[in-house]
């Protein structure tokens, strides 16, 4: 059955462009909405409409696009971007299917594609018991297809997308990035942190190994990014500082007195928060001196396999 697909914003890669071309090859109609110059850069060869008005006009604009092109399906990456939230709701009201991509719930080698929403808006059951029951029936080694995707490749695409965005003030003057920080600030943070990691990487690996192979029982708390959409939109925490305090209060009250906890930074953190200072302050306030260890990097596999437990907040490490 022939369908008409509308593509909204995708990842900062050629993925949506290639998916659109594949659907077109199968005989489906393809259209796209450009919200910024980066969308144009990664939407070459796809018929598109530009949205460069204020957000209050988006629903009317989309409804016109739906009608003009007979849209039956809408494809997007993430359901919490400002331009996606009203689009998802409007499509639902009009009987248009939403197909929402997201970073994989399981990594590597997995991506997530769900109908109508992801994460907290997923149609999957919210009852933990369901996952215990279904998980027990799944194969231990599900079939996966290995693929190569280096950090450098992804970084090049990300930079290209945001370099194109330099034209936004001219072409899309009302566009607001969905990320919590600007690309230049993010890139500067990466450079600073990666430079720092060059000098401490081996030391951190040694520390992680010592903890993992030591006699003291320990737990691991892998941090998430402060800019993570699920933290900002679907959690009780405004940032990782609040999470750290919440977990350490519980650890001080309930964990065995001989146990330790390792707090490991996210590999893509840009260094906005001084976690060492935050954790040191919590150690004093909650009487945890010597039981809390902070790692910038290193040894996740060894730590995870030797830990008594892992405390997660929207982390694939769990």
Model-assigned labels for residue ranges:
Residues 73-85, 296-318:
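A donor-sugar binding/catalytic signature common to diverse glycosyltransferases
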Residues 1-36:
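N-terminal subdomain of nucleotide-sugar transferases
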Residues 99-196:
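Active-site-proximal region of nucleotide-activated glycan assembly enzymes
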Residues 38-55:
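N-terminal beta-loop-helix "entrance" segment that forms/cooperates
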Residues 3-8, 65-81:
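Short N-terminal targeting/anchoring amphipathic segment
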């Amino acid at each position: 059955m022939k369908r008409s697909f509308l593509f909204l914003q995708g990842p900062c890669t050629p993925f949506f462009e290639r998916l659109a071309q594949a659907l077109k090859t199968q005989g489906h109609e393809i259209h796209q909405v450009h919200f910024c110059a980066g969308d144009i850069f990664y939407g070459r060869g796809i018929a598109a409409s530009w949205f460069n008005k204020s957000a209050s006009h988006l629903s009317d604009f989309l409804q016109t696009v739906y009608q003009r092109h007979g849209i039956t399906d809408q494809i997007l990456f993430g359901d919490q971007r400002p331009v996606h939230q009203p689009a998802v709701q409007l499509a639902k009201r009009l009987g248009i299917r939403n197909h929402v991509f997201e970073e994989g719930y399981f990594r590597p080698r997995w991506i997530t594609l769900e109908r109508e929403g992801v994460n907290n808006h997923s149609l999957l059951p919210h009852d933990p018991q369901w996952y215990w029951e279904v998980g027990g029936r799944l194969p231990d080694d599900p079939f996966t297809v290995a693929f190569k995707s280096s950090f450098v490749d992804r970084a090049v695409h990300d930079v290209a997308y945001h370099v194109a965005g330099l034209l936004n003030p001219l072409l899309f003057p009302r566009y607001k990035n969905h990320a919590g920080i600007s690309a230049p600030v993010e890139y500067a943070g990466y450079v600073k942190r990666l430079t720092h990691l060059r000098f401490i990487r081996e030391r951190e690996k040694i520390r992680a190994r010592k903890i993992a192979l030591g006699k003291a029982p320990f737990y691991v708390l892998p941090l998430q990014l402060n800019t993570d959409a699920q933290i900002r939109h679907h959690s009780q925490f405004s940032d990782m500082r609040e999470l750290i305090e919440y977990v350490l209060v519980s650890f001080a009250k309930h964990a065995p007195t001989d146990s330790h906890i390792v707090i490991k930074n996210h590999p893509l953190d840009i260094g906005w928060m001084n976690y060492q200072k935050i954790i040191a302050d919590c150690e004093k306030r909650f009487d945890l001196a010597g039981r809390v260890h902070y790692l910038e990097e290193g040894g996740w596999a060894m730590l995870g396999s030797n830990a008594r437990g892992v405390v997660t907040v929207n982390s694939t490490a769990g």
